[in-house]
Amino acid sequence: MSHQTGIQASEDVKEIFARARNGKYRLLKISIENEQLVVGSCSPPSDSWEQDYDSFVLPLLEDKQPCYVLFRLDSQNAQGYEWIFIAWSPDHSHVRQKMLYAATRATLKKEFGGGHIKDEVFGTVKEDVSLHGYKKYLLSQSSPAPLTAAEEELRQIKINEVQTDVSVDTKHQTLQGVAFPISRDAFQALEKLSKKQLNYVQLEIDIKNETIILANTENTELRDLPKRIPKDSARYHFFLYKHSHEGDYLESVVFIYSMPGYTCSIRERMLYSSCKSPLLEIVERQLQMDVIRKIEIDNGDELTADFLYDEVHPKQHAHKQSFAKPKGPAGKRGIRRLIRGPAEAEATTD
């Protein structure tokens, strides 16, 4: 399932889509404005689709602004006219804009009608989405030739739609997440936590400056943890969980990603979701911090002593169990959401 941005088409836009599917238009340019899909340009056909293509499509593409273009072919299938779906995401556009358009792509296809879309073309430069670029794309689909960079990026976007989060990689960018720089004091606080000189570090994203900054390092006991979770904004939390398990005293680092539902803006939700994995990779690889559990919550009320203990020591992995105990009643606390790393997922599969 792709990441949901909450952006939808208005009734006016849906009416334009209906007229387009009936053959009235050769091209539609769609943008995202004020968290809505809007049609910025409609063009009726002038000639054959090949003769219309470059003169219709290329002038609409801006150097620093992503958009979608729906271009109608002259061919039809059982549902009506067939269309090319063009996702334009230029190299010099803002990372946040790229993420937003990538996250909303599946929504637009659904609103327009996926059965009408014959081909999808993804481009970062105009050559990718020109008529020549489209024909190269068709050739690549019918042969085992290596994919172009743009085609490979489209393939990765499709893979991510089937998985969970939307993505784009660092501030140098791949499709695995956005690695915003970590401020010096935030990094130093994480170092102190790894050495157990601190027991709690809270980080936030400075959206304006695209940086992960330090928010809180207040000494925190387990009973204090719920009070550290903001009710109106997202945060990352690293907590040194001190507890006993089967007679052993343990100090385990737990990562908590708090996202208070839809009280946060779409942009904030997307940024926190996309920056999460690269941040954890830095913490685990560069700082050699062993993050024992990764948890996602909506609010601090979930962080009870029993909840945290059960997350760190799931009953199905409990040791020294002399006989198989019957399962407790289902749904006692609802479904817990864990952010599983690759190693955990592999262990679960085994």
Curated annotation (Swiss-Prot):
PTM remark: Phosphorylated on serine and threonine residues.
Keywords per UniProt: Acetylation, Actin-binding, Cytoplasm, Cytoskeleton, Phosphoprotein, Repeat
Location within or outside the cell: Cytoplasm; Cytoplasm, Cytoskeleton
Gene Ontology biological process terms, A to Z: barbed-end actin filament capping; negative regulation of actin filament polymerization; positive regulation of cardiac muscle hypertrophy
Record PTM Phosphotyrosine, positions in chain: Y309
In-chain residues carrying the UniProt-annotated modification N-acetylserine: S2
Entry-annotated residues carrying Phosphothreonine: T349
Keyword Transmembrane helix: no
Short name of one Pfam family: Cofilin_ADF
Sequence ranges assigned to domain ADF-H in this UniProt record: 2-139, 175-313
One GO cellular component term: perinuclear region of cytoplasm
Single GO MF annotation: protein-containing complex binding
Stated role: Actin-binding protein involved in motile and morphological processes. Inhibits actin polymerization, likely by sequestering G-actin. By capping the barbed ends of filaments, it also regulates motility. Seems to play an important role in clathrin-mediated endocytosis and distribution of endocytic organelles.
Designated name of the protein: Twinfilin-1
Organism: Mus musculus
